[in-house]
């Protein structure tokens, strides 16, 4: 914690001053003070962006998106149907707010389930490079406050991720699960759909979660089991 505080003083998250601001394809947009953006940025109608924000090169922000203050949006990012609150970092290559993967089998064809929800990313959170977050179908997909996602994570439609969570790279969530607060998930774990995972849960890397998990539990393995049981059976 001390190292984090010290390095933040010497290496602050600053807004780069050498961005080309001659972007042509910006529609009617509500910008506040000190918004800087790179080359080939496209911003749709009725987008709202708070003060002290940075938008990287080749990024697309589609109509009606809301971005709070002190946010950093990386390069090659696509954002649609999303509300981003304050002090949020979206790293390079993320796609946020696209339609989820939901279909009705109907005779010889699959009919896509409607997705009329949005994505909400709350204050002080970070979404790692190359991650994808699908918008909700009939409800919203939500990322809690002070939650950090590593690179190449997939969050499917309708998931609710709590506050103060840390999720390592290549974790995948199926749809409509709820994650409590202070949850830690190791890399390449998979979370099945329609589950309830409690507060203060630890999920080991590579685990497959197919059942609900109660508060203050540590699990590992496939299917994920109580950590003590897993270690006892895998010595």
Tell me what each language-model feature is.
Residues 1-18:
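Phosphate-bearing ligand-interacting subdomains
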Residues 25-26, 30-226:
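Structural signal for interior beta-strand "rungs" in well-ordered beta-sheet cores
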Residues 225, 229-235:
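Long, leucine- and charge-enriched amphipathic alpha-helices
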């Amino acid at each position: 914690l001390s190292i984090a505080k010290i390095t933040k003083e010497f290496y602050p998250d600053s807004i780069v001053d050498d961005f080309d601001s001659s972007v042509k394809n910006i529609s009617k947009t509500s910008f506040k003070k000190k918004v800087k953006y790179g080359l080939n940025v496209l911003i749709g109608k009725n987008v709202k962006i708070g003060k002290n924000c940075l938008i990287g090169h080749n990024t697309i922000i589609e109509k009606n998106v809301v971005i709070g203050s002190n946010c950093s949006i990386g390069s090659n990012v696509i954002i649609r149907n999303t509300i981003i609150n304050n002090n949020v970092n979206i790293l390079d290559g993320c796609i946020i707010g696209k339609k989820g993967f939901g279909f009705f089998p109907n005779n010889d064809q699959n009919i896509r389930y409607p997705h009329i929800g949005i994505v909400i990313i709350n204050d002080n959170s970070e979404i790692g490079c190359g991650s994808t977050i699908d918008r909700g179908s009939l409800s919203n997909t939500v990322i809690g406050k002070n939650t950090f996602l590593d690179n190449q994570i997939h969050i499917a439609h309708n998931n609710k991720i709590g506050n103060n969570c840390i999720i390592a790279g290549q974790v995948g969530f199926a749809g409509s699960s709820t994650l409590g607060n202070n949850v830690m998930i190791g890399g390449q774990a998979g979370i099945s759909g329609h589950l309830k995972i409690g507060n203060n849960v630890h999920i080991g890397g590579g685990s497959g979660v197919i059942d609900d998990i109660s508060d203050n539990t540590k699990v590992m393995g496939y299917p994920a089991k109580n950590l003590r049981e897993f270690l006892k059976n895998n010595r």
